[in-house]
Amino acid sequence: ILFYSLSRYYDLSDYGLSSGFRDWQLIAYNFIHLTFMHMFFNSIGYLIYKPVIAEYYGRKAPIIVIPISVILSSAIFCSEKPTFGASTIIFSMIGMYLSKIWQDGHSKRQKYTIMLLIILIMQSIFGYNVINWKIHISALAISFILSRLCTTFTMISRSKIS
């Protein structure tokens, strides 16, 4: 909220992620929202996925997976225009969630996959030329893969202990 409030009075575009970025911008851009709706929808996504991710993975995996997926996707797919907002964090959480659904083989898998596709289609319609698609999709994919690796290594280490 602080960064959103500041963006109402000061130009924070230098803090967004763009080509020629400084290292600290790989994290900072996630905390700057330029509109209330942007902040609102990211907050809703966070509130929806955080308890589910914590239940599925505990506290350690998200602390590892989310920063890695956010930093990797932003370093690889930054663009000429500055990128802002926590959507990359939300898409990382969605990737972790989809990984767990995939692993468990839920019958809900199709339902949630369709919901995710609707979100992506809505973004492409309403956010065309504004939203950095590549960062979102890569954060989702990277967090999905890292989550699968975390659960695989956790299962391997548990089987060796017992």
Locations of regions flagged by a protein language model:
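A detector for small-residue-rich transmembrane helices and their helix-helix packing motifs
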Residues: 1-162
